[in-house]
Structures are given as structure tokens and as C-alpha cells.
Amino acid sequence: MATLKPFAALRPKPELAERICELPYDVMSSDEARQMAAGNPLSFLHVSKPEIDLPSGTDLYAPEVYAKGKENFNRLIAEGALRQDTQPRFYLYRQIMGRHSQVGLVAAASCEEHLRGVIKKHELTRPDKEEDRVRHIEALNSQTGPVFLTYRAVAALDEFVARRITGKPEVDFTAKDGVHHTAWSVGDAEGIKFIAAEFARIPCLYIADGHHRSAAAARVYLSRSSGRQSALTSPGNDQSRLTSAATVGSSGEFLAVIFPHSQMQILPYNRVLKDLKNLSPDQLQ
């Protein structure tokens, strides 16, 4: 069975969402991120790629990078740009890219099920990248990017989602890259119970993207639950803050967005070579 839980998200103020929301941290270089966030102090890149606020050439894994991310994250909260919901809930998130549309469920997934293989993996992780995400989670006491999961579509869930997204969205904007983002929340007891029960019947979930994020979350969970506390889990600082970002404490959940397989679209992931090393294109082939 797949265990998904509602959570009290820390979300962008609706009218600021377009200025806050950004692409994932790992699809751009530091220089590209600096250009994208230039002149926009609300850009979430100040949190997800905080080296952009430090001198060029700063070691990406230096302690001051994570400290700057924490500082910027707390600033967005203090300014009211990010606000936490008062009650746990599920969230529905739609992306429209050209003619393609997909609607996923944003929820707290189980670190235990990740470790036991209920959440299926398909790739190995790089130690340096995994460690980077561990340190980012520990510094912020939050996860700032969801793990992208999928499951075999269930008709009852499809019908439930289709009904719910006819209501007025809470966030609705088109990003600079042309992708249209829309979000709704499911906070009523009946809706929450239905979603949890339907997923409890699903035998497994699959990671589509986010192996480093999920592995890092599981490591933080194991560390905290076994008593090897990070500096941020001192007495009085144990509140989990699953955000549009999300925190992992000893409760053992990680932020995920889960799409049915029927709406998934496989996109090319082409590599670009900067230097052929004196080889001709024919020789390279």
C-alpha cells in the first residue's frame, strides 16, 4: 500500500506566485540562475540556489551557501511572501505545456516506504549530489522541491480530481517559459479521507524524477529518528514544516507530487558537447 498524508504547506502568496516560483535548482547553472533572479528578490532561486547571492566562484558546497539559503528562506517567510496553512490538506497541481495537461496530487510521502521499496527507484544517486540535498534540508529544516512520483491510474481518483479542479483555483499563472501552473487545495475531511484511502489500495509508487531528493530526505529521517540529531533539531525546534517546500523530521515524510501514469509524457533529455577534443563528428560517432 502507498501511504500519503496531508500537510500544512508553506505556500506563495497567490498574487506573488509568478514572481516566486522558479524552475528546479538542478536544470540551470549558477550563472544562469543569477541572470534569472536578477532584480527579483522574491525569486525562489535565492533559496534553492543561494550561491547566486555570494561572490562568483564560491564553492557550491561551502557552509555559507546553505546558511544563505536559510537566511533567504526565512526572509520570504518573515515578509509574508510565503505563508503556512493552518490545517493539513492535500493539494492538486496542474501543469499545461502546449497541448499537454497533467494534474498531480501534492502530498507527504513516506520515507519508510522509500526505504522498503514500496516507492520504486530506477537509478542510482551520486554521493556528492545526495549530500548536497541532505545539507540543504538540514539547513532550512525544509524540503524546497518535490519528488516527482507516478502510479498506475485509478478511475475513482481521476474522477475525483476532475470534479475538484472545476472549482476556483488558489494559484493560477503562466510562467516565463509558457507553462501554465494552477493549484487547488483539498482541506475537507471527506476529500482527505477519500484520497488517503484510494492510495492505500495502490501497491506501489514510482519515482519519475527526484532520486537525490528522496534519498536525502530518507537519510535525514534516519538520522533524526535514531537520535543522531542535526543542529536544527534541538528541543523546541521539532515542528515539521512541509512547504511548497516541506520538512522532514522524525515523522518521516517527504514532499512529493504524484501524477497518474496516463498523464505522463516522456520528454527528450539531450546532452550537448562543448568540445569534440579534436575529433570530427564522424569520428565521435
Q: Where are the regions that the model predicts?
A:
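Surface-exposed, charge/polar-rich loops and edge strands
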Residues: 1-225, 249-285
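Intrinsic disorder/low-complexity segments
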Residues: 222-251
